[in-house]
Amino acid sequence: MANAWNIDAARHTYAVPYWGDGYVDINDAGHIVIRPHGSGGPGFSLPDIVERARDEGLRLPLLVRFPDILADRLARLQGAFAKAIGEWHYAGGYTAVYPIKVNQQRGVVAELVAAGAQGFGLEAGSKPELMAVLAMARPGSIVICNGYKDREYIRLALIGRKLGLRIHIVIEKPSELDHVITEAKALNVEPLLGVRVRLASIGAGKWQNTGGDKGKFGLSPAQVLNLVTRLDQAGLKHTLKLQHFHMGSQISNVRDIANGMREATRYFVELTRLGVPLDIVDVGGGLGVDYEGSRSRSHNSINYSIEQYAATIVQSLAEAVESEGLQAPHIITEAGRAMTAHHAVMVVNVSDVETVPVGSLPPADRDEPAVLRHLREVHDELDTRPPLELFHEAQHHLQEGQALYALGQLSLAARARLDELFYAIANAVRARLSPAERSHRQALDELDEKLVDKYFVNFSVFESIPDVWAIDQIFPIAPIARLHEQPTRRGVLVDLTCDSDGRIDNYVDAEGVDVSLPLHALKEGEAYRLGIFMVGAYQETLGDIHNLFGDTDAVNVRVDGGNYVFAHKRRGDTTDLMLDYVGYDLEALRRSYRERIAAAGIDGEQAEGLFVTLNEGLTGYTYLSEGVR
């Protein structure tokens, strides 16, 4: 079997062609390669990038961003809508709007603004985001103001309108209109308004509460009608130019998009009949990405392409306006996840491994407890009895032995042999089970969870991939090197935090999703590094400082001809910064260190040396040192 391993086998094992979308590949040296311009562009070895970053003073864990992927994703999105508009002879245009909540990093926003030129806009959902957008948006470009708004938010948005931006204030709740009317008069500026309608249609998935009747935002049908009446009474009906709705986030099934569009177009038709001069339809978010590469309706996948998504939206609007004899509205999408997810990879190093027992039978003691003798009898019958019977019997004796140990009736040495015997049986049983046998599948799942190594990884799930903990999000993971070697172990990844949730339970592989990941045995003196891919959407913003692990080091890698350059490097958070954030007085800490050194009776050079070491700990990286090159 080992002779059959090659680079294609590695691609298949880690499902790289399916989730990589042309941006990720494996070269003949077994290195992960990143192609920022897609499959036809130059590729760069991720291990080489990491080594160069370390040479320039950066440390692991390391967030590696590829800004050129952002531009490529935007171009794909714009191209898909241009194609659909042409095929359907649609008279309206299209603008891609980026909701900066997905990733507010200035470099991300600036890259997309530069790449989008005039066919691009920004969305803000809060006052801080609006302040960033007012400075970053191109003059004359579209800006969408979503989220709940107070008078100050609306005043700031109207100031942006005076400054030449096409700012649409989207009414999310009825009370916002009062602030709009008051502030518009005070500033002597005519607003551009939108209305967010709350669709009954809802897509299945982990983010379904962002759409549908139970959605947090948007107006009900009665509230929409009341808004139109109030605008008419205030002489502002002509300012309502935009209809907005949100079908959900990471919509997996293209049929859900079609259903949502069917309902949304009815709102457009009905509002137009009421004399509302709508000329923009903002379909919000929902365009997903295929994290697991299965092209399915799984929550972490999608069963459609960007082209199919664009065609579904354009077709829905084209058919609606044609049947009603209406003017085709301009289309806006807020597909932030699809723009940003692929552009970032978190590179982490394995600091240690806890391996499961290899399966050899420990020698018997003359006075061995009965529970151990029973397990040996099970082992002796491996070749003569059905494997499921043996597995269930072994589980029974394991639980019996664990109970005896808790009652003080089994020694620590006997407790250790209990585990060794059980794992010897479990390994043998696992080899005799087949996933083709339906009756074997539950036992296989249990054994696959038990018979895996623990790989201790130098990072925090809560800081770097918080959606793994929060919503069981799946991100593709693979070793970044040694992929020309067949992995001989299976493992689960656990992080540095003192929390049982600081682990990854599900992994992308060739068959979809599994409870463990194929990995290599560690080599003495050689770093073993993994890439956690597609972390460019939401993860940096949602990251949590559990155990005071802060932001990691980061580097932006930009294509420069046939090579690459580091466009920007950022050192991660230090311990003093994290302690200051949670209210510690740093100088008081230093004074305390000196006082404790003196109280311990230490003075002179030794005292100074200890203080220097403590101070270095205070100003150091919050993560572990890698220790090998």
Task: Provide a role label for each language-model segment.
Residues I26-P99, Q104:
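Low-complexity, highly charged intrinsically disordered N-terminal segments
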Residues H31, S39, I69, N103-Q105, ...:
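Short, glycine-/Ser/Thr-/acidic-enriched flexible segments
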Residues L60, V64, G86-A91, L274-L278, ...:
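Flexible, glycine/charged-enriched surface loops at secondary-structure junctions
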Residues M1-R59, R558, V565, T574-D576:
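Conserved, well-structured core domains of diverse proteins
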Residues D68-R76, N226, E263, T312:
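A non-catalytic, amphipathic alpha-helix used as a structural packing/dimerization or gating element
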Residues I251-N259, D290-Q308, A338-V353, D544:
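Short glycine/threonine-rich loop-to-helix capping motif typified by GTGT followed
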Residues H89-D282, L287-E292, N303-Q308, S316, ...:
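Active-site-proximal beta-alpha core segment in soluble small-molecule metabolic enzymes
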Residues V314, A318-R629:
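Charged (often Lys/Glu-rich) extended helix/loop segments that serve as interaction or gating elements
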